Amino acid sequence: MDKLDMLFKKQYDLQVQGMHYDFANMTTEQRAAYVKEYTMHCEHEMHEALQEIPFFKPWKRYDKDAVSEKNQVMWAMARKEFVDALHFFLCVAIGLGFTPDELYAMYCDKNAVNYDRQKDQATYKPSADET
């Protein structure tokens, strides 16, 4: 079992055993509500991660020396919040019905498209199925 499989399994087990979700018997409406709820949680945690990053707020005056002294702590806090978001991201992936292999395959396909886009940005025009 690879690490992505393990992450999915751990999160699935938490959702089923700890949170008592029954994915096999969810109605379409329940599944949609689940995905919506966990997407919002993921967005919230990502916003918290952003707030920990030095110089996040463009309108705020930062003391560069103070930021430098707290730099490692700030990045560590951002990483912690990112891991919180990852839990919710995995919940969304599970709610959407992804398996680790499907997510990996779709990621690789999209990554190839993104590389193609970068090769010639000036002339690239996405097809309808690439968006």
Task: Say what each PLM segment does.
Residues M1-T131:
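Flexible "arm" and connector segments at domain edges
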